[in-house]
């Protein structure tokens, strides 16, 4: 398989070189192989020979490298609710009669920008974070999810301050919050169909939660609708 690894910056002065990165490939039967690749600069491209057809790939599964991505993985065999603190996400499995492998990652850096002009003009995408949901799901797997947003959370790393705060220090109205989704990095962001915004108190205090009434594999982030 052909692989391309992109290095992005989070509070770092430059791209790093000679970084050992573990990359794990998994097939539909959950067979895994993990390799270490030394990465330098923004892009590292290579070809990896595998004895199976991979349907999932992820980096740094054992957290040996300290970076701006924190994730958790789990095997789901029944209906269950899991608070995934490292992923800043609550997973609610509502139906599972078989077994599913789930991995959720939280990226503490800016998502790729919106490419389409009319979407870019209408929405301000989060400059600070996004999520990735991946896995090998059974045919019976059905789940929802939840995560918290806060525009005034210094203790939590100010993850949504830039998105939610207006120049005068006040907050955007939470009615203008939307969730964006895309299946993978080759696709454009679009407004996700299955979410609700739940304010905690005032709609202009910059805190609340997002409920994802369905979850699908892909990347998720927040955006604010620009005023006309």
Task: Give the residues covered by each predicted segment.
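Non-catalytic accessory/interaction domains
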Residues: 1-113, 144
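Hydrophobic beta-strand residues in large extracellular and virion-surface proteins
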Residues: 3, 23, 104, 131-133, ...
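Beta-strand-rich interaction surfaces with strong enrichment in secreted/lumenal proteins
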Residues: 34-37, 132-136, 211-212
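Surface-exposed intrinsically disordered loops and tails
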Residues: 24, 160-166, 198-201
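Proteolytic processing hotspots in large secreted/extracellular or virion-associated proteins
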Residues: 114-185
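Proteolytic cleavage junctions
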Residues: 51-61, 67-81, 156, 169-228
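Short, ordered beta-strand-loop transition motifs
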Residues: 1, 119, 123-127, 137-138, ...
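Exposed aromatic-hydrophobic patches
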Residues: 43-51, 144-151, 205-214
């Amino acid at each position: 398989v052909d692989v391309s690894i992109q290095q992005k910056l989070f509070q770092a002065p430059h791209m790093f070189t000679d970084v050992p990165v573990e990359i794990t490939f998994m097939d539909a039967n959950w067979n895994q192989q993990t390799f270490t690749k030394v990465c330098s600069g923004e892009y590292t491209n290579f070809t990896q020979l595998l004895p199976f057809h991979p349907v999932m790939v992820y980096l740094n599964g054992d957290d040996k490298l300290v970076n701006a991505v924190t994730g958790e993985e789990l095997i789901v065999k029944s209906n269950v609710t899991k608070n995934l603190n490292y992923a800043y996400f609550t997973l609610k499995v509502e139906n599972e009669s078989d077994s599913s492998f789930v991995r959720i990652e939280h990226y503490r850096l800016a998502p790729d920008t919106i490419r389409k002009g009319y979407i870019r003009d209408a929405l301000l995408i989060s400059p600070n974070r996004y999520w990735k949901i991946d896995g090998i799901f059974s045919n019976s797997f059905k789940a929802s999810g939840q995560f918290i947003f806060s525009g005034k959370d210094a203790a939590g790393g100010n993850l949504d301050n830039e998105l939610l705060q207006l120049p005068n220090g006040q907050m955007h109205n939470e009615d203008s919050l939307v969730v964006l989704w895309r299946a993978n990095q080759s696709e454009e962001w679009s407004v996700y169909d299955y979410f609700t915004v739940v304010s905690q108190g005032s709609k202009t205090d910059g805190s609340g939660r997002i409920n994802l009434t369905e979850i699908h594999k892909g990347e998720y982030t927040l955006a604010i609708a620009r005023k006309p």
